[in-house]
Amino acid sequence: MDMRRIVILFALVFSITAVAQENETMIVRLAEIEVYPQHLKEYLEFANEVDRLSVEQEPGVICLYPMQSAEDSTKIRILEIYASEEAYQSHLKTDHFQKYKQGTLHMVKDLKLPTMKPLAPETMKLIFKKQR
């Protein structure tokens, strides 16, 4: 095997290892939220604001993407991706998150925060600009 192929092979292995290690530390959640119908409009305003500010202002917040069920508008899902546990903990302490959390406590009927395992972590950089 010539030197050029060895260098290319080494670079490829190094890149794959780096991506795998990076994604091992990432936190991925799919928040499952049910909102009381009478508070839905106000809740959506809070959610959109905190998600926008978090992505704009926090380097460790890769994605906060809110979605609403087409079948039941009171069911909200938020795709949450943080660069690390430290980024997640930092996010919880921000003024905009605290405003959201305290402002919506009475609006939320049910909340689940399951941690997810990405099945194709190598595509993260293709999808999320902040991962590049």
Please describe what each predicted stretch is.
Residues 27-57:
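N-terminal targeting signals for Sec/Tat export/insertion, comprising classic cleavable signal peptides
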Residues 13-14, 47-50, 95, 104-107, ...:
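Alpha-helix boundary/capping residues
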Residues 26-34, 63-92, 130:
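Short, well-ordered beta-strand segments in beta-rich or mixed alpha/beta enzyme
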